[in-house]
């Protein structure tokens, strides 16, 4: 299936390549570089590129491109999912999926790729199995290996490889048994000039950190599970139980993993947490304009909206901006024409505003349309969809674990049109 894999940085340098069948020349990546030059942004490079003799299927993660070379037609999403598993494995092993981390652990990287793909077909992608096959790097292990010439490859077959729950290894023991869940939601929205919602959607995930001894069987229930759409599950979840009772029943992997990802697409269920009052005007045959925006919380949710950043791509005729913020600080790049206002927290008693003059090129025509505002924010201890965990029950073990749930709401692609 997958013949070769190339890792490419943002500068266009191929810093690692791996071949499972015949060696494919690096020149095949020229088709990828051509598509990259045509793309307006790095995220807009086509994930599937057809060439005369190959297909190039790629993902972009952490400022790196993972480009796989395929010689026969395969389901592209199958390959894309595998490439994401590779990136997730690097993140799990090295703490980050970066060019520096991969170069520092290049031997382990090749060992992992050899185990994850067998003759071009995915074999072992579960982190628990891989960690039994290839030990994660430590300072002590790296020092011993450099002296003795040994490798990180284990000498025993993973206990989970042949079981019906391959995602969990046997014999797990902890002094402190704990199970923590993070409910993280991103809200994507488009707000028109009048403040009405044109589009709104919530993308959510539940990430788990499970450190439990033995072979626990967990059941996670919600107060309102019916609002979830398009749920994607970790393989450990019993799907029939979810279909019948809307309860997540599973034997968890050991450590950190993504339990589910979901979507809330009903616009009447999506609450918009912030509002923006704006007045941006450019006069005809004038060298100046007015800029005035105020941001505030839309409803009293009892939670503080923090980490607010407003980014505006101003028209090309803008030379400079003389603005006064009542809170935070702003920067304007006269080259890229990007205005960034770092607001910080919002308090309902004092709404932050940014207002002042815009200097335009003399004699230039009035901009055809006003710029849009892109907003970033974060709300701690709130799931904007209203999703709440009801309880976590454990079966199969007699100890009582520590349990906890954390909620976070973030802005995804949140745009206000002016």
Curated annotation (Swiss-Prot):
Localization, UniProt: Golgi apparatus; Cytoplasmic vesicle membrane
Chief subcellular location: Golgi
Gene Ontology, cellular component aspect: axon cytoplasm; clathrin adaptor complex; cytoplasmic vesicle; cytoplasmic vesicle membrane; Golgi apparatus
Protein's membrane topology: Peripheral membrane protein
Keywords noted in UniProt: Cytoplasmic vesicle, Golgi apparatus, Membrane, Protein transport, Transport
A GO BP annotation: endocytosis
Pfam families according to UniProt: Adap_comp_sub, Clat_adaptor_s
InterPro entries linked to this entry: Adaptor_comp_med_subunit, AP2_Mu_C_sf, AP_mu_sigma_su, Clathrin_mu, Clathrin_mu_CS, Longin-like_dom_sf, MHD
Entry annotated with the keyword Protein transport: yes
Domain MHD, chain residue ranges per copy: 176-417
Assembly behavior: Adaptor protein complex 3 (AP-3) is a heterotetramer composed of two large adaptins (delta-type subunit AP3D1 and beta-type subunit AP3B1 or AP3B2), a medium adaptin (mu-type subunit AP3M1 or AP3M2) and a small adaptin (sigma-type subunit APS1 or AP3S2). Interacts with AGAP1. AP-3 associates with the BLOC-1 complex.
Function: Part of the AP-3 complex, an adaptor-related complex which is not clathrin-associated. The complex is associated with the Golgi region as well as more peripheral structures. It facilitates the budding of vesicles from the Golgi membrane and may be directly involved in trafficking to lysosomes. In concert with the BLOC-1 complex, AP-3 is required to target cargos into vesicles assembled at cell bodies for delivery into neurites and nerve terminals.
Family in the record: Belongs to the adaptor complexes medium subunit family.
Protein name (record): AP-3 complex subunit mu-1
Species per Swiss-Prot/TrEMBL record: Bos taurus (Bovine)
């Amino acid at each position: 299936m997958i013949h070769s894999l190339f890792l490419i940085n943002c500068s266009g340098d191929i810093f690692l390549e791996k071949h499972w069948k015949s060696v494919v020349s690096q020149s095949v990546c020229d088709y990828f570089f051509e598509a990259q030059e045509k793309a307006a942004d790095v995220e807009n490079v086509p994930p599937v590129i057809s060439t005369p003799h190959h297909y190039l299927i790629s993902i972009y993660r952490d400022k790196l491109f993972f480009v796989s070379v395929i010689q026969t037609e395969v389901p592209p999403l199958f390959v894309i999912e595998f490439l994401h598993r590779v990136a997730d494995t690097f993140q799990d092993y090295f703490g980050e999926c970066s060019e520096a981390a991969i170069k520092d652990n290049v031997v382990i990287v090749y060992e992992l790729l050899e185990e994850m793909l067998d003759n071009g077909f995915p074999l072992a992608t579960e982190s628990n199995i891989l960690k039994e096959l290839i030990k994660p790097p430590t300072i002590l292990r790296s020092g011993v290996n450099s002296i003795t010439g040994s490798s990180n490859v284990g000498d025993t077959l993973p206990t989970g490889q042949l079981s019906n729950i391959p995602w969990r290894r046997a014999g797990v023991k902890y002094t402190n048994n704990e199970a923590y869940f993070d409910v993280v939601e991103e809200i994507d929205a488009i707000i028109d000039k009048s403040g009405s919602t044109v589009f709104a959607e919530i993308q959510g995930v539940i990430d788990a950190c499970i450190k439990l001894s033995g072979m626990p069987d967990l059941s996670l229930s919600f107060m309102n599970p019916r609002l979830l759409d398009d749920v994607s599950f970790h393989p450990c979840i019993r799907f029939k139980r979810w279909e019948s009772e809307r309860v997540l029943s599973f034997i968890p992997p050991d450590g950190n993993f993504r339990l589910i990802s979901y979507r809330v697409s009903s616009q009447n269920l999506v609450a918009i947490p912030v509002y923006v009052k704006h007045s941006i005007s450019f006069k005809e045959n004038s060298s100046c304009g007015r800029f005035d925006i105020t941001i505030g919380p839309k409803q009293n949710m009892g939670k503080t909206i923090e980490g607010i950043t407003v980014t505006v791509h101003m028209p090309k005729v803008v030379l400079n901006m003389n603005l006064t913020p009542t809170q935070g600080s702003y920067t304007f790049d006269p080259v890229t024409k990007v205005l960034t206002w770092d607001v910080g927290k919002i308090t309902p008693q004092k709404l932050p505003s940014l207002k002042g003059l815009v200097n335009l090129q003399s004699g230039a025509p009035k901009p055809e349309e006003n710029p849009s505002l892109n907003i970033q924010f974060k709300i701690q201890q709130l799931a904007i969809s209203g999703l709440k965990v009801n309880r976590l029950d454990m079966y199969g073990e007699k100890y009582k674990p520590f349990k906890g749930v954390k909620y976070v709401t973030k802005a995804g692609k949140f745009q206000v049109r002016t």
